[in-house]
């Protein structure tokens, strides 16, 4: 980040393994072997930070068992709720999608990085009243501290 930009952390969250309720192969505390044997939905993006998740999955051997890929998270709950595919998503997405889509989620059996969400603004807007108001609103609505 250049010296011209300021930032503030809003929240951090873990990634979780999300799947449809009553998935025949998924259970809390699943083994790495079980996790590797299920078919995975991959969110195929080169944008940071999710590219680090795909790298972690590839190291664990998941790419070879990727049955389907999508370019964005928006379709993920619809796909996972009607298939036996498993996907790695940010925990807040899993939490909001679980009830309406009849999904379940659990901690994945492989180590994944934590996702940090920040807001950024250019220094020329640091004293702008509208920008300050918007930043304050974002912090009020989304910050975990």
Model-derived segments and their meaning:
Residues 46-104:
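Hydrophobic hinge/microswitch elements
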Residues 18, 42-43, 69, 87, ...:
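Active-site-adjacent beta-strand anchor residues
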Residues 3, 25-27, 39-60, 127-131, ...:
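Secondary-structure junction motif
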Residues 8, 33, 77-78:
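Alpha-helical segments flanking ligand/cofactor-binding loops in enzyme cores
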Residues 20-22, 26-32, 93, 103-145:
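A late-sequence structural motif
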Residues 1-15, 19, 104-106:
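Short beta-strand-centered segments that line the small-molecule binding cleft or hinge
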